[in-house]
Amino acid sequence: MRKSSIRRRATAFGTAGALVTATLIAGAVSAPAASAAPADGHGHGRSWDREARGAAIAAARAARAGIDWEDCAADWNLPKPIQCGYVTVPMDYAKPYGKQIRLAVDRIGNTGTRSERQGALIYNPGGPGGSGLRFPARVTNKSAVWANTAKAYDFVGFDPRGVGHSAPISCVDPQEFVKAPKADPVPGSEADKRAQRKLAREYAEGCFERSGEMLPHMTTPNTARDLDVIRAALGEKKLNYLGVSYGTYLGAVYGTLFPDHVRRMVVDSVVNPSRDKIWYQANLDQDVAFEGRWKDWQDWVAANDAAYHLGDTRAEVQDQWLKLRAAAAKKPLGGVVGPAELISFFQSAPYYDSAWAPTAEIFSKYVAGDTQALVDAAAPDLSDTAGNASAENGNAVYTAVECTDAKWPANWRTWDRDNTRLHRDHPFMTWANAWMNLPCATWPVKQQTPLNVKTGKGLPPVLIVQSERDAATPYEGAVELHQRFRGSRLITERDAGSHGVTGLVNPCINDRVDTYLLTGRTDARDVTCAPHATPRP
């Protein structure tokens, strides 16, 4: 489940090389020997060998070329002194001399002295489909939380392959993508299910028609290889990395493929890296976690009934939600906000407790008779063509990566059985999430076997950060990665649930992230932090 994706979608989707490798690797960049074929017994074998050689060729080439930094284009909306550039990578790492694509990158230099500089810190915000180009703005915005880290590191962002300015892909016309209202995600009949299945199939077909050449190469391992090429282009021998949400899985895959290329790695709000979870089961697990965090928000709203007047028990708040949902299903608010748009708007509350008060306030206004506030918040803006194109692109990348990364059930009966059962006790998100991912059931290109994430030779301690009640990436994912990456440390924010907790308001977490990035030191044992304060109305 990508944040705000429901609201934004239109459907409810050789030999010569080896010789050159040896020559290039002897120069500017060390051979990523750890990225050779993982001994996982799942048939990657020769293809992984070819892609490992291709990644080495591309990294060596990038190290020689560097990056031509210049002022960012005006339509990138990045303030000076942030600089922008491109890094060239193979579309297919098995064919490193074949078609090339350009990846957009940006940076801002460290704010400290030359002697304080430790290198570049590269960021991925998640998705898949999220752009990291806003990361350097944490320096221009003078964020106090990042001030110490900014003294030591250049802040570097990038658009992953397929995203934004990096060979963007598309699955449907953006203006069609944002039209509303969408069909109610909760099916009322078998006919409703057939209609949603048709939309999902058409979306998958649209991805192939509009972006078919890129689809087979839209995988997390390829993005990890891209990340290593960016590292080399920056002139960095080792990677310093901060990944949030899906960015944690990207980091886990990178750490498995290139363990001896990691210097520091912070992963925050962790995707469960188990092959059994990527990606079908992971989305079912999300539905359970979202229901729990939805209830947390309802409890908070009830505790603040004096401010919101939505009921002083969770049951009363839920009753108001069901009434709103039923009204929108019967007659979309403002003609454009139905149940799908409501879920897209209200899902901000389970994602981030910073959204608790704004979401409750708009809900309260609706119950008090002000429908327009909710329409303004939940309806798409058809005049925002740039924003709509970005939203469509983000959803296309999400679908392409998750559908290509792993095998999904092709039998509709499996989807119907699992989601019908789950919906009974976890109704908030289940069917909406199912329809979003259903294009993977009819995906038109080969689906891969996920990498076996594990500790390789040279991997340093990785810092894992996780809130205990995170909805989008349930806590068990952090525990799983902690077990797989030997020597890692886990920081848990107890009884909290915000998704992405580094750089927020808990000094118990922020101070430890700072210490790790600046010194490499971690606590001798895993740490449990008290929760940050709950929001005020």
From Swiss-Prot:
GO biological process: proteolysis
Location relative to the cell: Secreted
Domain AB hydrolase-1: from-to ranges: 119-497
Record GO terms (molecular function): tripeptide aminopeptidase activity
Name under which the protein is recorded: Tripeptidyl aminopeptidase
Function: Cleaves tripeptides from the N-termini of proteins. Does not cleave mono- or dipeptides, or N-terminally blocked peptides.
Record family assignment: Belongs to the peptidase S33 family.
Pfam families: Abhydrolase_4 (PF08386)
Maturation-removed propeptide residues: 37-39
Signal peptide, first to last residue: 1-36
GO CC annotation terms, alphabetical: extracellular region
EC annotation from Swiss-Prot or TrEMBL: 3.4.14.-
Positions of the catalytic residues: S245 (nucleophile), D470, H499 (proton donor)
Keywords: Aminopeptidase, Hydrolase, Protease, Secreted, Signal
Main location: secreted
Enzyme class: hydrolase
Gene: tap
